[in-house]
Amino acid sequence: MFEKITEQPSLYDRLEEKSTREILEDINREDRKVAEAVSRTIPMIERLVEQIIPRMEQGGRLFYMGAGTSGRLGVLDASEIPPTFGMPPTFVIGLIAGGDRALRNPVEKAEDNTERGWEELLSHGVNSSDTVIGIAASGTTPYVIGALREARRHGILTGCICSNIESPLAAEADCPIEVIVGPEYVTGSSRMKSGTAQKMILNMISTSIMIRLGRVKGNRMVNMQLSNNKLIDRGTRMLMSEFDLSYEDARTLLLRYGSVRIASESMKQKPPKK
């Protein structure tokens, strides 16, 4: 039975009468519940990830879809895949109701359009090798529900992340993830605990997939894009550690090849010094 936990009254009241310290401690107390709630969903996350990996190994893509905070978190996670793991920006794609304008400002009624989500997926050439994950704390967002319903009808793997039990969105997902974090500190403000849970789960999904696809070596981002001085320094220190090089030699090697992984492979192919 569908239960709208995200709209239940807060466990706290008369918030406007509290001190700053009391508010902060209350929020932190509630946030500590999120990690435990996420831990209970690990079997659900595993089931979804294990089905995504073989699809992506064969060239399939991953789509995140959401509105408001949920959509922004999907776009955020997708945007981190190229710099962190060196994958093309078309590998994981985040779609938000209302388009890029909605990343900064609310777009009136964009999330209420049931057809628009599927139309956007079609514009990206979505097909049965891809996966679509809908993100909606309430599990009732029409933009996301409509997209998942059509995706599933076309034989596309579907998953979802929501914070209510047996929601309409979960009914459209092959692999639903229901992370129940309880009432929000500010009643109905699902950008809080529900949003935190979504971010944690998205991190787990994308990171576990990238590791399983060989984009991490040991515990290091050997395929990261060298897009700023901080990352060049990080890559340099990786090579220093692996091959006992000076900072200058490691940096020169890294910049020559433009990739930690390729630089490392080049060193391993060199004949040993006599």
Curated annotation (Swiss-Prot):
Residues 52-215 form the SIS domain. InterPro entries: Etherase_MurQ, Glucokinase_regulatory_CS, MURQ/GCKR, SIS_dom, SIS_dom_sf. Pfam families: GKRP_SIS_N. Its EC number is 4.2.1.126. The active site is at 80 (proton donor), 111. It comes from the Bacteria. Pathway: Amino-sugar metabolism; N-acetylmuramate degradation. It is an enzyme of class 4 (lyase). The keyword Glycoprotein does not apply. CDD domains: SIS_Etherase (cd05007). Keywords: Carbohydrate metabolism, Lyase. It catalyses: N-acetyl-D-muramate 6-phosphate + H2O = N-acetyl-D-glucosamine 6-phosphate + (R)-lactate. GO terms for molecular function: carbohydrate derivative binding; carbon-oxygen lyase activity; ether hydrolase activity. GO terms for biological process: amino sugar catabolic process; N-acetylmuramic acid catabolic process; peptidoglycan turnover. HAMAP family: MurQ (MF_00068). Specifically catalyzes the cleavage of the D-lactyl ether substituent of MurNAc 6-phosphate, producing GlcNAc 6-phosphate and D-lactate. Belongs to the GCKR-like family. MurNAc-6-P etherase subfamily. Homodimer. PANTHER family: GLUCOKINASE REGULATORY PROTEIN. A lyase-type mechanism (elimination/hydration) is suggested for the cleavage of the lactyl ether bond of MurNAc 6-phosphate, with the formation of an alpha,beta-unsaturated aldehyde intermediate with (E)-stereochemistry, followed by the syn addition of water to give product. This is N-acetylmuramic acid 6-phosphate etherase.
